[in-house]
C-alpha cells in the first residue's frame, strides 16, 4: 500500500509544478548563500592559519562550498523539470531520469544534513588545532630574524590586540617560553647570565608578557614585566589586584569566535536543508501523480501521488534485496572473469 497517498487533478498538478518551480529558484539562491558562508569561513580560517596546527579545520568550509555549488546545479535542473512537467512531450524526455534524479536528491539531502551537523561538532577538533598552533606560534615569536618565521611576532601581537587575549590559555603561558630574541639580550649582564644558567634548557625566561597583552582600558600604566614581583611596583599585589592584562587566553577567544560563526552557519544550513527536503518531497509527488495519469493526452484526468509506493518496512526490505542482487551479480561476473583467465594461464 502506498504511503501518504494524495489525489491530484489537473489544477492541483499545475499548482504543484508552479510552486516547485518557484521554490527551486529560491533554493538556487540558498545554494549561493551556502557557498558564500563556506567561502567566508574559509577566508576567516586562512587569516589565522599561522596559529593552526593542521588543515583539518577546512573540512567544514570546503564542504559548504561544495554543497552550495551542487545545490545551485540540482535546483536549476529541478526548476527546468518542473517547467517542462506539464507538457506531455517534454515530460516524456525527463521521465526515465526522474527516479535516479530523486535518489540523488535524497543522497544530497543526507549529506547536507551531515554537513550542518559538522558545523556544530567541529569544536573539539578546532580546539586541539588552535591549542597546538598557538603554542608553536608563541615559541616562534622571538624568531624575527629567521626566514619563514619573521612574521610570527606581528601575527601574535595583532591576534592578541584584536581578540583581547593573552597567551594560549592565559598570560602565564608567556612565562614558560623565551619570547625575547637573543639579539636583544645583553649577555655581558649578570642578570641575563644568571637567568640563562638557572634554566635547564639555557633559555631566558621572565615573568613578563609582550606589550600586546596590555589592556588599554586599565587606568594604571601597563605592568608587563616582573608581573609576579609585588616589590617591583608601587601599591601592587598580583594575587589580589585586577591585572591590567587580558585575562582570557587566545585559544578560548578564537574558539568562541569560530564556534559562534559555525553555529550560525549550522542553523542556516539546517533551515536550507528543511527547504530542500520539502522540494524533494514535492518533486516525488509531482513525479508519481504525472506517472499515474492513464492517458497523457487527457490532461484533465485525476491521478494519485504518493511518497513511497509501499510501506516503509516493505520499501526497506525491497532496497536490501536489490543491494543483495547487485552484490551477487558482481560476484558472478568476477567468477566468470576468473574462469575465463584460467584456460589462458594453462
From Swiss-Prot:
Q: Which GO terms describe its cellular component?
A: membrane; photoreceptor inner segment; photoreceptor outer segment; plasma membrane
Q: Mutating residue 32 to V has which effect? A: In some patients with macular dystrophy
* Alphabetic keyword roster: Cell adhesion, Cell projection, Cone-rod dystrophy, Disease variant, Disulfide bond, Glycoprotein, Membrane, Retinitis pigmentosa, Sensory transduction, Transmembrane, Transmembrane helix, Vision
**Coiled-coil annotated residue ranges, if any:** none
Where, in residue ranges, is this chain on the Cytoplasmic side? 1-24, 81-99, 291-346
The subcellular location is: Membrane; Cell projection, Cilium, Photoreceptor outer segment; Photoreceptor inner segment
Q: Which Pfam families match?
A: Tetraspanin (PF00335)
Output the InterPro entries linked to this UniProt entry: Peripherin/rom-1 (IPR000830), Peripherin/rom-1_CS (IPR018498), Peripherin_LEL (IPR042026), Tetraspanin/Peripherin (IPR018499), Tetraspanin_EC2_sf (IPR008952)
Residue spans, topological domain Lumenal: 44-61, 124-264
Residue ranges of the region described as Interaction with MREG: 341-346
Q: Which PROSITE patterns does UniProt cross-reference here?
A: RDS_ROM1
GO biological process entries? cell adhesion; detection of light stimulus involved in visual perception; photoreceptor cell outer segment organization; protein heterooligomerization; protein homooligomerization; protein localization to plasma membrane; protein maturation; response to low light intensity stimulus
Record family assignment = Belongs to the PRPH2/ROM1 family.
Assembly mode: Homodimer; disulfide-linked. Forms a homotetramer. Forms a heterotetramer with ROM1. Homotetramer and heterotetramer core complexes go on to form higher order complexes by formation of intermolecular disulfide bonds. Interacts with MREG. Interacts with STX3. Interacts with SNAP25.
Q: What protein am I looking at?
A: Peripherin-2
Please name the source species.
Answer: Homo sapiens (Human)
Amino acid at each position: 500500500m502506498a504511503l501518504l497517498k494524495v489525489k491530484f487533478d489537473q489544477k492541483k498538478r499545475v499548482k504543484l509544478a508552479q510552486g516547485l518551480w518557484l521554490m527551486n529558484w529560491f533554493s538556487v539562491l540558498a545554494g549561493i548563500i551556502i557557498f558564500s558562508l563556506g567561502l567566508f569561513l574559509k577566508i576567516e580560517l586562512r587569516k589565522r592559519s599561522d596559529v593552526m596546527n593542521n588543515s583539518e579545520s577546512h573540512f567544514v568550509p570546503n564542504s559548504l562550498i561544495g554543497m552550495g555549488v551542487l545545490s545551485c546545479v540540482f535546483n536549476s535542473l529541478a526548476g527546468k523539470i518542473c517547467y517542462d512537467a506539464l507538457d506531455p512531450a517534454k515530460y516524456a524526455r525527463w521521465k526515465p531520469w526522474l527516479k535516479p534524479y530523486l535518489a540523488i536528491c535524497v543522497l544530497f539531502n543526507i549529506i547536507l544534513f551531515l554537513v550542518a551537523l559538522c558545523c556544530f561538532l567541529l569544536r573539539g577538533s578546532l580546539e586541539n588545532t588552535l591549542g597546538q598552533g598557538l603554542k608553536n606560534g608563541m615559541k616562534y615569536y622571538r624568531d624575527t630574524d629567521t626566514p619563514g618565521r619573521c612574521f610570527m611576532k606581528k601575527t601574535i601581537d595583532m591576534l592578541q590586540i584584536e581578540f583581547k587575549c593573552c597567551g594560549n590559555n592565559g598570560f602565564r603561558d608567556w612565562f614558560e617560553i623565551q619570547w625575547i630574541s637573543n639579539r636583544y639580550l645583553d649577555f655581558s649582564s649578570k642578570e641575563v647570565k644568571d637567568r640563562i644558567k638557572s634554566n635547564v634548557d639555557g633559555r631566558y625566561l621572565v615573568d613578563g608578557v609582550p606589550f600586546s597583552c596590555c589592556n588599554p582600558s586599565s587606568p594604571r600604566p601597563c605592568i608587563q614585566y616582573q608581573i609576579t614581583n609585588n616589590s617591583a611596583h608601587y601599591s601592587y599585589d598580583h594575587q589580589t589586584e585586577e591585572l591590567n592584562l587580558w585575562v582570557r587566553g587566545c585559544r578560548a577567544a578564537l574558539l568562541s569566535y569560530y564556534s559562534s560563526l559555525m553555529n550560525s552557519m549550522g542553523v542556516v544550513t539546517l533551515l536550507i536543508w528543511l527547504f530542500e527536503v520539502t522540494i524533494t518531497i514535492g518533486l516525488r509527488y509531482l513525479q508519481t501523480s504525472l506517472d499515474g495519469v492513464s492517458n497523457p493526452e487527457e490532461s484533465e484526468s485525476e491521478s494519485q501521488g504518493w511518497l513511497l509506493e509501499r510501506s516503509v518496512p516493505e520499501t526497506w526490505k525491497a532496497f536490501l534485496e536489490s543491494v543483495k542482487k547487485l552484490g551477487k551479480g558482481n560476484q558472478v561476473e568476477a567468477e566468470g572473469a576468473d574462469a575465463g583467465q584460467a584456460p589462458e594461464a594453462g
